[in-house]
């Protein structure tokens, strides 16, 4: 049994390759079911977003597992393997486990520390659970990874502070005004940067939105998205008097708001603070405006400096999380190592319980006059003796499972307790149950062959 991750992401493949290997979200369950039918695949979860497509799989052999995952991708997307193989990254064993923890924690994302990927991984995992493509190993691993990601975000600053210019503008506005509730934000320019800024401010609860643009129709279109009002450039001075926050992003080659205009506006505002963000290049606002009282002016370089400082904070947090992941990988490996000892412990317990039951039967035959209460007392104490005797051997068996010579030591353990045949029966029963689980999962599918997405 081996764990692998086969996939590509924004680091390894350009968007024109990523879009060819991107699963439609509604077809992910169908894709995982189709992959589960492939040779060598024991469990699988597929994670597919705009920035990554990754197949997490438990396989019986590494070489065949890699081969059949690649072939599955080729068949599903109707692409020759050689057209995308060079963009794939393959991770195995500890590296594969570590990668999942990094992805869920957001430290492998384009936006360091983002949490959207955690929800996407969780959704794929829950889908795999529902349709039966996950089993003992991935049920444990993905639950551990999701739990860890939440803890990492709670215990570090990985998700704090803005790492985009538009978010930095919101962060600054909150520092100046505290709450943005009932604040009036005006946007000068109806381009993409202005839209991003207003989107983030609107999401933070601003009360009123005004869009000012040379082309009134564009102003109307953008304002409608945020239940705001549109104004022409002729109404700029009035908007400066009314707004609490102004964000400028025009394509003008000279200052749209000069020092003299703002001197006049500032006097009429009578000390009311105005937060101004100039994200235009060239700048829309005369930098001397920042010298006026109660005017807080920031340009693109100021915001970029904040973003870089915040990103450095997140990178330090990411380093801390990477250290934490090392402990998580060890913890998962320790858990996996106990899987081999499960049938041994189960067989030992069953033998001990059988001896206890046979002993009770013998006692009852020789002492037929025992009351029900006496039988219960004897049963309770004989079971207690059995449990106390088993405690140390079970602990030893678990330690053996972590030993480099685990197979030899566990074989000797089975011989000492005379449970070799019982262990083999336990292994066969567990294998049978796993096969039945897979058959039940496949039975829920339609009788038709999987529909591939072209």
UniProtKB/Swiss-Prot annotation:
It catalyses: (S)-4-amino-5-oxopentanoate + tRNA(Glu) + NADP(+) = L-glutamyl-tRNA(Glu) + NADPH + H(+). PROSITE patterns: GLUTR (PS00747). Disulfide bonds: none annotated. The active site is at 50 (nucleophile). Keywords: NADP, Oxidoreductase, Porphyrin biosynthesis. NADP(+) binds at residues 189-194. GO terms for molecular function: glutamyl-tRNA reductase activity; NADP binding. CDD domains: NAD_bind_Glutamyl_tRNA_reduct (cd05213). Possesses an unusual extended V-shaped dimeric structure with each monomer consisting of three distinct domains arranged along a curved 'spinal' alpha-helix. The N-terminal catalytic domain specifically recognizes the glutamate moiety of the substrate. The second domain is the NADPH-binding domain, and the third C-terminal domain is responsible for dimerization. NCBIfam families: hemA (TIGR01035), PRK00045.1-3 (NF000744). During catalysis, the active site Cys acts as a nucleophile attacking the alpha-carbonyl group of tRNA-bound glutamate with the formation of a thioester intermediate between enzyme and glutamate, and the concomitant release of tRNA(Glu). The thioester intermediate is finally reduced by direct hydride transfer from NADPH, to form the product GSA. Belongs to the glutamyl-tRNA reductase family. HAMAP family: Glu_tRNA_reductase. This is Glutamyl-tRNA reductase. It comes from Lysinibacillus sphaericus (strain C3-41).
